[in-house]
Amino acid sequence: MNLTLILTVAPPLLIVAYIIKADKFPEPTSLCISTFLLGCLLCIPAASLNNYFIPDLSYAYLAGFTEESLKFAAIYFYIRKKTDFDEPMDAIVYGTLISLGFATLENFQYVYNAGNPDFIAILRSFTAIPLHACCGIIMGYYFGLYIFKDRNKLNLFKSLFFAISFHATYNYFATRNVLLMFIVLIILISFARKLHKLLKIEQLSKQN
């Protein structure tokens, strides 16, 4: 296994491992794998939609809408119906798996088409990979609230809205102002960590 391949797949898989391990009530391995692979497959329609709707990089922010909408559809129409999808943290786990499956295949596209693939792989491990992971966490958190807490459609809306908004804003500044891009990313990571921590505390209270 060469260095470029390791740099491409290791960052998303490490985050996947952390999210799965942090879940106090583990999910079936088979469903985790199929969800991750589904995220990979979503790259295909996403690429087609992005090529059609995004004429050049100045419109890259529109990718936030197409990509997060596809991830949301996967959670709503596939994950929601699974019997093992039975508590709020599950939504974060599967939301992150879909997002990082997507990010992994996308990583191959960017890294192996770059002039300096190792540099791009390292750069994306600190930018695009955390972006996708955190959007998955946030989407999952609010989707879990909708399914398991109150059936409030506002939470269903937030699930998609926040993911699209953060992703689109990140992409917008990525082509215009790198400093603001990193500020958006820091805010996104902080927000996602806070939501994940809330559900970890809730799980611990159920164990006691």
Language-model-derived ranges and their functions:
Residues 1-208:
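Hydrophobic alpha-helical segments at protein termini of multi-pass membrane proteins
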